[in-house]
Amino acid sequence: MKYMIPDEEFIRREGVPITKEEIRAVSIGKLNLNKDDVVVDVGCGSGGMTVEIAKRCKFVYAIDYLDGAIEVTKQNLAKFNIKNCQIIKGRAEDVLDKLEFNKAFIGGTKNIEKIIEILDKKKINHIVANTIVLENAAKIINEFESRGYNVDAVNVFISYAKKIPSGHMFLAKNPITIIKAVR
């Protein structure tokens, strides 16, 4: 098994983001997955994290409210022959209560306080949340800490080398804050 599937192997759709390969690697590491885990992927987007999580655990619930995200996630699950996943169209705060899982990955941060509240009430003790927005990082950290979680946050900067006439230069991508909350 490849450690991480290269970005270019995923089916993409304009306007539906995919978590970059290196960010997926760090996020998967922070999730500390094992074969018995049942994981919810909140804001599944293009399904990059959904596919990578499903390769490493028992089952994944992939949630998104955007039609485009649901469609491209379905395509990526089919492409990589992922069978241990259920895609749910809807808002996480409306469906999380109905699901049984022991870990959560949050890639979409709309209504984050409500999502964390539900995860807390469900006694989910291992959560990883990714955000590109600085204010959301602070909000997520504060929300977890106020609920008694131990929080570990890392800001990851990825740069890719590009050949130029005089050699190579690095082109930076947007930094991502990866927040792990456990108790």
Swiss-Prot record:
Q: Which residues bind S-adenosyl-L-methionine?
A: 19, 43-47, 64, 92
UniProt GO molecular function: cobalt-precorrin-6B C5-methyltransferase activity; protein methyltransferase activity
Q: What is its EC number?
A: 2.1.1.196
As its record notes, the protein acts as a catalyst of: Co-precorrin-6B + S-adenosyl-L-methionine = Co-precorrin-7 + S-adenosyl-L-homocysteine + CO2
Q: Does the keyword Cell membrane apply?
A: no
User: According to its UniProt record, what is one Pfam family this protein matches?
Assistant: Methyltransf_31
The pathway where this protein functions is: Cofactor biosynthesis; adenosylcobalamin biosynthesis; cob(II)yrinate a,c-diamide from sirohydrochlorin (anaerobic route): step 8/10
What does the record list as GO biological process?
anaerobic cobalamin biosynthetic process; methylation
Q: Which UniProt keywords apply?
A: Cobalamin biosynthesis, Methyltransferase, S-adenosyl-L-methionine, Transferase
Name the enzyme group at the top EC level. Answer: transferase
* InterPro entries, sorted: CbiT, Cbl_synth_MTase_CbiT, Cobalamin_biosynth_MTase, Methyltranfer_dom, SAM-dependent_MTases_sf
Spell out the Gene3D superfamilies in the cross-references. Answer: Vaccinia Virus protein VP39
Stored SUPFAM superfamilies: S-adenosyl-L-methionine-dependent methyltransferases
Highest taxon in the source lineage: Archaea
Which family is annotated? Belongs to the methyltransferase superfamily. Archaeal-type CbiT family.
Please give the NCBIfam families that the UniProt record associates with this protein. CbiT
Q: Which PANTHER family match?
A: COBALT-PRECORRIN-6B C(15)-METHYLTRANSFERASE (DECARBOXYLATING) (PTHR43182), COBALT-PRECORRIN-7 C(5)-METHYLTRANSFERASE (PTHR43182:SF1)
Q: What is this protein called?
A: Probable cobalt-precorrin-6B C(15)-methyltransferase (decarboxylating)
Q: Which organism is it from?
A: Methanocaldococcus jannaschii (strain ATCC 43067 / DSM 2661 / JAL-1 / JCM 10045 / NBRC 100440)
Question: Which lineage?
Answer: Archaea, Methanobacteriati, Methanobacteriota, Methanomada group, Methanococci
